[in-house]
Curated annotation (Swiss-Prot):
GO terms for molecular function: ATP binding; kinase activity; metal ion binding. This is Pseudouridine kinase. It comes from the Eukaryota. The keyword Methyltransferase does not apply. Belongs to the carbohydrate kinase PfkB family. Changing D311A: Reduces kinase activity 171-fold. It is an enzyme of class 2 (transferase). Pseudouridine binds at D12, T26, G37, V38, A39, R40, N41, N137, K166, D311. The gene is PUKI. CDD domains: YeiC_kinase_like (cd01941). Changing N137A: Reduces kinase activity 39-fold. It comes from Arabidopsis thaliana (Mouse-ear cress). GO terms for cellular component: peroxisome.
């Protein structure tokens, strides 16, 4: 079976001003509708990279749902639709640099209707999945139900934090989670939630100018909290500074994916040929519960907007893992997919050109460098 994705399908309303937004009045620009929601974006990205995920979510029987489903090509079996459900909508106002300046999210339907009972109907899909990804739009009860079903069959779980506030829902499920993918602020919020004290403070804007090594040192205590609470892999997204891959020991062995039955499709063939797994073969000797950390760079992009980048990083990584690549190769594909996302007007590009993705993944992979290996976590 292919990966299972559980979470939000949302209609995004994007307001893109031609000039700097002014409080209290309107400015000229474009207002566009775009399919969105972390889980939906991840599933769409995976599908466009040649893997067919199974999506579990909820939608209304209304106009916004019809817009969302217009280009939907995946199974509808896992998507609950009822007349009393209002399809989730998020309205975003961008600044002239393509970053979100303000937004309002009306996504209560995800928590109210995507219940443990609905999720448990798809026990077979989850128990036989390559990997389960859940987004933090789910209620705590729904997250626990999803993770327990996966744990019963040793299916790896990827937790996508969604936002600073919702990222704290990691507290009740950390022991089930294999991978998390926070940005710096979400990482701090998750660490505080797990240690039940506000020991860590939000990253200051001037700290983004630190060297990668200094940035890692600043984030390391929070990363260790997650790893010591059961999470096996922490991928910290750093925006234009790339991403950190941190794990207990060898990250290639962190996921319990049976590689005998992986499909080895087009993504695998193209990336395996340019991203040699032997480049990091020395990791194979690491059997101790030590801290591993690696930095992955970004590559130059013609940025149109930044929403969707993190979702495509996750989607590209999950698709690659499902196709047989190791975690380091897969994250390189994820970062290449994120680049394609920021160069698109949509949250997920209409298509991914695999020659460009594999070429960009090669650049990321060859630029990756280890920051720490074989140091005790104690």
């Amino acid at each position: 079976m292919e990966p299972v994705i559980i979470g939000a399908l949302i209609l995004d309303v994007h307001a893109k001003p031609s000039t700097t937004p002014i409080s209290g009045t309107t400015v000229p620009g474009q207002v566009l509708f775009a399919p969105g929601g972390v889980a939906r974006n991840v599933a769409d990205c995976i599908f466009k990279l040649g893997i067919t995920p199974f999506m579990i979510g909820t939608l209304g029987l209304d106009g916004p749902a019809n817009v969302l489903l217009k280009e939907w090509k995946l199974s509808m079996k896992g998507i609950l639709r009822r007349e009393d459900i209002s399809t989730p909508i998020v309205s975003l106002v961008y600044d002239t640099n393509g970053e979100v300046a303000a937004g309002v999210a009306g996504v209560d339907a995800v928590e109210n209707f995507l219940t443990p009972e609905w999720i448990q109907r798809f026990e077979y899909n989850i128990s036989s999945a390559r990997l389960l990804m859940v987004d933090a739009n789910l209620s705590s009860l729904a997250l626990e139900a999803s993770c327990k079903l996966a744990a019963e069959s040793s299916v790896p779980v990827w937790f996508e934090p969604v936002s600073v506030t919702k990222s704290q829902r990691i507290a009740s499920i950390a022991k089930y989670v294999t991978i998390v993918s926070p940005n710096q602020d979400e990482l701090i919020a998750m660490a505080n939630a797990l240690c039940a004290k506000n020991l860590f403070h939000p990253f200051r804007s001037d700290e983004n100018k630190l060297s990668i090594e200094d940035m890692f040192r600043a984030l390391k205590p929070a990363i260790l909290v997650l790893l010591k609470n059961g999470v096996k892999v922490v991928i910290v997204t750093l925006g234009s500074n790339g991403a950190l891959l941190c794990s207990k020991g060898n990250p290639k062995k962190a996921l319990n994916i049976d590689r005998k039955f992986l499909r080895s499709g087009e993504v695998f063939k193209r990336v395996q040929s340019v991203c040699s797994p032997n480049r990091f073969s020395e990791l194979g000797s690491n059997r101790s519960p030590s801290l591993f950390a690696m930095h992955f760079p970004t590559i130059p992009a013609k940025v149109k907007k930044l929403t969707g980048a993190g979702d495509c990083l996750v989607g590209g990584t999950v698709a690659s893992l499902s196709d047989g690549l190791d975690l380091i190769q897969s994250l390189a594909v994820g970062i290449a997919s994120a680049k394609a996302a920021v160069e698109s007007d949509d949250n997920v590009p209409p298509e991914f050109k695999l020659d460009l993705i594999s070429g960009d993944a090669e650049l990321v992979y060859n630029g990756a460098k280890m920051l720490m290996v074989h140091q005790s976590m104690l």
